[in-house]
Amino acid sequence: MQGESTIARRDFLTTALTAASSALTIGLSHTDAHGQEPTHQSYTTTKSPLSFDNLYDTSVLATTLKGEAADRLALRRLVDAWAHCADRRLAEAQSNLFVPNGTIFNYEGDPNTHQPHSTIKGRAAIRSALAVLNTFTVTLHMNGQSDAIIAGDHAIGETYCVVHQFSEQNGQRKCQTLGIRYYDTFLRQESRWYFAERKLVIDWSDSRISVP
């Protein structure tokens, strides 16, 4: 069972599937190139404002909020969009949450004491890696506490997430639960927030037989 758990954890690391966050913050390493806030507008759409298609919009224009409040809402939507797309198997939309050359670094242990286990760079590679989700019958990503520091078009944040992954093996349903943290670097382009870099950290995992 330990060997199977380790393999499953490494498979998960290789694909970096999750969202999320924590009240702890990390030092800001980027500065604003322009030092100005974008002009905000109210969100308009040809669809009904109550359409489910309008959920998880990461644009600061998709709200009547202004300034930092609009940025924080968009960043939280971005984190939640990753979880939503993972569970709904929307690989194209999920990979597009990154800038074109965005990178995921996967860790099995704290980044301060461990080297990345694997690295995934670019939207195409991220999209390809997401295919591992199809090996599970169902997944559930539950985002927890999250915080961010914003400086112009740049931001950083930490996110906590608990992931449940169900699979069928030898006629039995199995569940693997992962405790994950994300250290994110964000970039705002044309009023929309994207992931520039994600450090996925698996703190713990548990595998067991699941009885419906």
Each language-model region and where it sits:
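A beta-strand edge to alpha-helix "cap/lid" segment located at domain peripheries
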Residues: 14-19, 28, 36-63, 134-212
